[in-house]
Design a protein with these regions (language model features):
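N-terminal beta1-alpha1 ligand-phosphate binding loop
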Residues: 6-27, 190-191
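Cysteine-nucleophile active-site neighborhood
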Residues: 50-127
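Structural alpha-helical scaffold elements that stabilize or flank donor/cofactor-binding regions
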Residues: 38-39, 72
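Extreme N-terminal starter segment of soluble prokaryotic enzymes
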Residues: 2-7, 183
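Amide-donor transfer/coupling interface in amidating biosynthetic enzymes
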Residues: 74, 112-209
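An anion/phosphate-binding loop that grips the pyrophosphate of nucleotide cofactors and donors
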Residues: 42
Length: 209
């Protein structure tokens, strides 16, 4: 099988090289770019994200990413969000929200609000188990593994049509991963999650056509 061509979206997000290297290690042909044609023609698009929700959205808008993502999804072309790249797929985030305001607007691919974790220690930084649903394509062959998280905010719910993998930190049960046709995302960092993360990326590559 020919190597799958994957674009990791370049919009100023930090530490994207680790995602590029992780994808290359599992056999992908990877390009780091925001070129419209490259994004449209790639077998898969990865949207990484670290830092503040609003800053990630500003970066995405600066390269026209919302339109590029919408076009890919309309054509059934796979997209994978990572960390804040998952959060921005929801309607909005409570991060930096003040009284009387709605918070930062996201891409609204999935309805819902990203909220601060309720836990004795925030951020959630380290390895945690997850609970994938039966039949998950991302977690095929992966059982009882831990994945690496670094975040202070998370989605606590998702629309019924989204297949959700759950995790827990403190008092908060949150969306650790989500699968919805061509659109998938992880709150954890698969590129920093060792063999289990590599297997998940390999599974995602296997869904690309």
């Amino acid at each position: 099988m020919n190597a799958r061509r994957v674009v990791v979206l370049e919009y100023g997000s930090g530490n994207v090289r680790s995602a590029v290297r992780a994808l290359e290690r599992v056999g992908a042909e990877v390009e780091l770019t925001a070129d419209v044609t490259a994004v449209a023609e790639a077998d898969g698009l990865v949207v990484p994200g670290v830092g503040a929700f609003a800053a990630v959205m500003d970066g995405l808008r600066s390269v026209g990413a919302p339109r590029m993502i919408d076009r890919r999804l309309a054509g059934g072309r796979p997209v994978l969000g990572i960390c804040v790249g998952l959060q921005v797929l929801f309607t909005s985030s409570a991060e930096h929200r003040t009284e009387g305001e709605d918070g930062s607007a996201g891409l609204d691919e999935w309805s819902g609000v990203v909220e601060r974790l309720e836990a004795p220690v925030v951020p959630h930084m380290g390895w945690s188990t997850v609970e994938p649903p039966a039949g998950s394509a991302l977690f095929a062959g992966i059982e009882d593994e831990r994945f690496y998280f670094v975040h202070s905010y998370a989605a606590r719910s998702a629309p019924d049509f989204v297949s959700v993998t759950w995790s827990q930190h403190g008092h908060t049960r949150f969306v650790a991963a989500a699968e919805n046709g061509p659109l998938c995302a992880t709150q954890f960092h698969p590129e920093k999650s060792g063999d289990a993360g590599a297997e998940l990326l390999r599974n995602w590559l296997g869904t690309l056509s």
